[in-house]
C-alpha cells in the first residue's frame, strides 16, 4: 500500500466482513479507506457508495468472495481475483505424511470435540474439501486472475480456463531481504525451515 501513496489520484478502499460487528465500521489511514461490514449483504451498497473502477478479491475459498464477485458483476464492475495457496491443492496434500491412525477420529473424539472444540484432522480435511469446491465455483466464473508463481498460473489455467492471467511478482516484506544472510560454507548445511500455516499440519 505504501507504493500507492505518491499517487494521490488513486483511491483505495479495503473491505472485509466481521460477523461480530452490529454495524459497519469505517476509517482512513495513510490515504486508504477501510470498511468493516457485518456481513456480505452490505457489499452492493458499498460498491454503489465507493464506485470503484475495479474490485480486487483476495481469498477465493470463502462465501464472501462469491458474494462480492456477484455484487460487482451485478453492477458491471470488473473483478480481479488474487490466488495463492489454492484450496484444491491444499486439500489434496493437507495430511501428507500424517499417519492414517491420526487422520480418522472415532466417535469418542467427535463427542469430545463438540464439548471442547479443537480441530480434528478428518473434520479439517472435510472443511478443506468443501472450501476447494467453493473456490472452484468462484474461479470457474472468473475473467481475470492474478498470481505470483508458475503454480498459480497452472492452477488458474485449470480452475479459471476462460480467465486472463496477470502475473504479479509480489514480494515478501523488506525485512526478509535485508536480514542477515547465511552461506552454506560457513553454516555447514542449509537451515531446515518448517513453515506451517497456523494450525494446519
Language model regions located:
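Membrane-proximal helix-turn-helix segments that form the acceptor-binding/catalytic region
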Residues: 87, 103-144, 158
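Conserved donor-binding/catalytic core segment of Leloir-type glycosyltransferases
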Residues: 184-201
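Short hydrophobic "strand-cap" motifs at the C-terminus of beta-strands
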Residues: 148, 168, 194-198
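A short, charged, and often flexible helix/loop element on the N-terminal side
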Residues: 29-45, 57, 115-127
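Helix-loop-beta element that forms the nucleotide-linked donor phosphate-binding surface
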Residues: 136-141, 146-147, 153-172, 179
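N-terminal subdomain of nucleotide-sugar transferases
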Residues: 1-35
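Active-site proximal beta-strand in glycosyltransferases
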Residues: 73-117, 146, 166-169
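Short N-terminal targeting/anchoring amphipathic segment
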Residues: 46-63, 68, 78-80
Amino acid at each position: 500500500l505504501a507504493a500507492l501513496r505518491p499517487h494521490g489520484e488513486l483511491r483505495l478502499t479495503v473491505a472485509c466482513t466481521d460477523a461480530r460487528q452490529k454495524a459497519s465500521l469505517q476509517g482512513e489511514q495513510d490515504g486508504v479507506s477501510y470498511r468493516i461490514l457485518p456481513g456480505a449483504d452490505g457489499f452492493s451498497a458499498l460498491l454503489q457508495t465507493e464506485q470503484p473502477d475495479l474490485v480486487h478479491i483476495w481469498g477465493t475459498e470463502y462465501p464472501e468472495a462469491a458474494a462480492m464477485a456477484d455484487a460487482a458483476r451485478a453492477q458491471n464492475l470488473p473483478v480481479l481475483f488474487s490466488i495463492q495457496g489454492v484450496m484444491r491443492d491444499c486439500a489434496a496434500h493437507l495430511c501428507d505424511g500424517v499417519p492414517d491412525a491420526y487422520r480418522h477420529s472415532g466417535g469418542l473424539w467427535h463427542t469430545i470435540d463438540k464439548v471442547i472444540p479443537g480441530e480434528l484432522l478428518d473434520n479439517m480435511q472435510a472443511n478443506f474439501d468443501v472450501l476447494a469446491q467453493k473456490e472452484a465455483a468462484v474461479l470457474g466464473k472468473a475473467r481475470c486472475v492474478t498470481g505470483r508463481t508458475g503454480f498459480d498460473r497452472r492452477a488458474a489455467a485449470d480452475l479459471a480456463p476462460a480467465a486472463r492471467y496477470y502475473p504479479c511478482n509480489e514480494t515478501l516484506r523488506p525485512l526478509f531481504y535485508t536480514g542477515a544472510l547465511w552461506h552454506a560454507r560457513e553454516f555447514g548445511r542449509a537451515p531446515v525451515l518448517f513453515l506451517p500455516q497456523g494450525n494446519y499440519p
